[in-house]
Amino acid sequence: MAEGGAADLDTQRSDIATLLKTSLRKGDTWYLVDSRWFKQWKKYVGFDSWDKYQMGDQNVYPGPIDNSGLLKDGDAQSLKEHLIDELDYILLPTEGWNKLVSWYTLMEGQEPIARKVVEQGMFVKHCKVEVYLTELKLCENGNMNNVVTRRFSKADTIDTIEKEIRKIFSIPDEKETRLWNKYMSNTFEPLNKPDSTIQDAGLYQGQVLVIEQKNEDGTWPRGPSTPKSPGASNFSTLPKISPSSLSNNYNNMNNRNVKNSNYCLPSYTAYKNYDYSEPGRNNEQPGLCGLSNLGNTCFMNSAIQCLSNTPPLTEYFLNDKYQEELNFDNPLGMRGEIAKSYAELIKQMWSGKFSYVTPRAFKTQVGRFAPQFSGYQQQDCQELLAFLLDGLHEDLNRIRKKPYIQLKDADGRPDKVVAEEAWENHLKRNDSIIVDIFHGLFKSTLVCPECAKISVTFDPFCYLTLPLPMKKERTLEVYLVRMDPLTKPMQYKVVVPKIGNILDLCTALSALSGIPADKMIVTDIYNHRFHRIFAMDENLSSIMERDDIYVFEININRTEDTEHVIIPVCLREKFRHSSYTHHTGSSLFGQPFLMAVPRNNTEDKLYNLLLLRMCRYVKISTETEETEGSLHCCKDQNINGNGPNGIHEEGSPSEMETDEPDDESSQDQELPSENENSQSEDSVGGDNDSENGLCTEDTCKGQLTGHKKRLFTFQFNNLGNTDINYIKDDTRHIRFDDRQLRLDERSFLALDWDPDLKKRYFDENAAEDFEKHESVEYKPPKKPFVKLKDCIELFTTKEKLGAEDPWYCPNCKEHQQATKKLDLWSLPPVLVVHLKRFSYSRYMRDKLDTLVDFPINDLDMSEFLINPNAGPCRYNLIAVSNHYGGMGGGHYTAFAKNKDDGKWYYFDDSSVSTASEDQIVSKAAYVLFYQRQDTFSGTGFFPLDRETKGASAATGIPLESDEDSNDNDNDIENENCMHTN
């Protein structure tokens, strides 16, 4: 066992490694741990092989578990938004959490962040830790201004919520109550089933719940309510009565809605139980219907508005054509549930009766079949669109039994033949309204770099994901700590290559500061310690936006100077009485620093160098302290000297107390007496002889350099928790030889301060003070826009596959980094274009805010079609999904063109407003919907002639000439663009 009764480090490492592999089980409790603390713990216990050299090193001791980085300020349980598993936090089962707390305790004032495991999915069940709880606003019917916020798990029941509300508002147990959902415009819906979970009930983030108490005369303040279905009852908490009397009580209620100027109760049909218009607004323009935000569901609202304003798809659902094609038996589908739910929603939105609807039932259905969308976290609009298009396709697939098809390579055959074959094969398994409207065909060409094997395939697509020209640079904020100890750190903003290394950062900082790049050391400081000390060749991608990057000036040549060593130094405050079960009796404070010192040094010289390095914020009293004696420290003579830290290296306490007066030394400052704190040459001022840092009589005997007291003691740490014997025996790292202290690159130094001395002499405000360089105010110049066609050209540019995504060459029988080229063969009636604005890496997430200039009308795609029979292929924009904000979060809206009046509108959740074309092109544009011009004929026209299906899209040969189709506008199509009809 380790110190304080904690398990030894090998046991800790083994236990936690095993518990991290624990399977999730519904109902279990797991705990969040800040990933930065956990990484520090991994270093301390040597969890990973590359951290073994730091195992047991007190300089990387993690201290109490600190989850403050996960929490919003001032709230012990409210998590910051958009935290990501493993990047921001680690999940531990209860046993693992309890072990860590027993070994390290939890930071004072913090509470455990416990979360339940919930089950998600309808057919394919899987468990997930519910990191973000659902925040509900609770109030009483008689006083809705007094709102209390509480957080619940999606696994909690309505009964659990009701009990909590009763407790909050001190409602007696015998008092009969019932619960209501309160929506916008004072619209209410009763919660009927006490055993329903929050997830089943579809309660969303920020939902207002109202508890209503029954009047003394037996009536309800809100009046009676209508059950959803025969036999259903409103959720009420009643005194103990028989089931029969309970049934009679509700059966005697009037089946009517109660409405007044303040509220209305809805009728309970499929959507009407929660979809409302504002009172008095029942004659809306069809399609101009907003969607209520259920809590971070703007991504869904934006996607739905774009699909809703896709004329051929909406006409298909409004005309009930979907009912004939529902596929309930498709194993890849959702038993028709997604299609039916979407159809009901579209009918509500286009009924002209509502100014907005609440898509709660649709959201619930999506979450059942796609658990990643079941919560109320911000999601990607394009990812939801991909799911909806695929889900609708499978629910409406006209193919009831999919045949097995052997895919063939081109093997030198003409593109026209291979394309026709590929499209026919696709239609044998996939034939739906989604295929009719959204599917196109592209050509993929792979070339092996070894044997020159060429592989050509034709593959269908539902949308185009277009890359944007990547930003080649990023800005980083760093703090430069100069050698001059009197100079405050300075904050800089540097522009560095996005795919660069630490040397690039130093070079950029050198241009601003004048300090040579080779005289810089870049570090990441976290929780008062060095989290990382970077090598010059490390990638900048490992630096995240939230990291505190400090760059230290070191005036030595690290490759040639053999006389000096760079030592990391951290500051610790001693505890007089530690209540921690496993702690060294100290806690870190202040900012650590790096300094270069001679390899051969005396303890006294090192102490003096350290004191001078901190002279800006360590204030020495100028009053003589007769009772303690004095140690004189020259205020200025050792600053800006010839040493690697801007100070002289020759001074020692005895040398500095010279009898030869000068103008500088006459300003001597006094330190307290050292007689109580002198160090033996073996202990180096360590903790081994006295827990409070004071030497015993034996260790101090014969080692006094005068009646002087030091402000701090210091302790060296290397591969482990260094003790006296280790220092004496292991001459590879630290040793004494004729009272000389030997150091090397593996040495770490901790300065231990007595709390009283720290309070008296250490100025924390001065230590944390810094200045700002003018570069901090730098704003990058406006980036020039790119055209949509530039993105399409980039999409069709030849590229080399990455090492992590090779292609298996059938000739070489090996995976190769082949060259790949994509080309467009045929395009669908509605072209969905996804602008790839978000980029991901192991350490960084980023959003590209490049302005893409896309045409509203007359997007000519003909030049990008390699089909030799392709003719004119022009598109008009019909909808745009917008994303405002950064990578971690933001807001989605939509622009869409109404199919009935041909005007543009702006959809922002429940709000709908008119828009002009000059508003549409912006940096926020994320997903574009284009409809081909030859599919417009009147209002929402789209031909669905089942007789014309075949390989025409693949071949590019029109089924009939324009002259043949003059008699029937419904047959006009440019088959060179269209793939099936």
From Swiss-Prot:
Keyword entries, A-Z: Acetylation, Cytoplasm, Host-virus interaction, Hydrolase, Mitochondrion, Nucleus, Phosphoprotein, Protease, Thiol protease, Ubl conjugation, Ubl conjugation pathway
Using the record's annotations, give every residue carrying the modification Phosphothreonine: 226, 602
Q: Ranges of Acidic residues compositional bias?
A: 656-673, 960-974
**Enzyme group, top EC level?**
hydrolase
Cite the record's tissue specificity text: Expressed in skeletal muscle, kidney, heart, placenta, liver, thymus, lung, and ovary, with little or no expression in other tissues.
GO cellular component terms, alphabetically, are: cytoplasm; cytosol; mitochondrion; nuclear body; nucleoplasm; nucleus
**UniProt protein name:** Ubiquitin carboxyl-terminal hydrolase 15
**Under which EC number(s) is this enzyme classified?**
3.4.19.12
Modified residue Phosphoserine is at which positions? 229, 242, 961, 965
Which InterPro entries does the UniProt record give?
Answer: DUSP-like_sf, Papain-like_cys_pep_sf, Pept_C19_DUSP, Peptidase_C19_UCH, RNA3'P_cycl/enolpyr_Trfase_a/b, Ub_carboxyl-term_hydrolase, Ub_USP-typ, Ubiquitin-like_domsf
Q: Where does the record place the DUSP domain?
A: 7-118
How does this protein assemble? A homodimer structure has been reported; however it is unclear whether the protein form a homodimer in vivo. Identified in a complex with the COP9 signalosome complex (CSN). Interacts with SMAD1, SMAD2 and SMAD3; the interaction is direct. Forms a complex with SMURF2 and SMAD7. Interacts with TGFBR1. Interacts with SART3; the interaction is direct. May interact with RNF20 and RNF40. May interact with PRKN. Interacts with INCA1. (Microbial infection) Interacts with human papillomavirus type 16 protein E6.
Q: Which residues form the signal peptide?
A: none
Q: Which reaction does it catalyse?
A: Thiol-dependent hydrolysis of ester, thioester, amide, peptide and isopeptide bonds formed by the C-terminal Gly of ubiquitin (a 76-residue protein attached to proteins as an intracellular targeting signal)
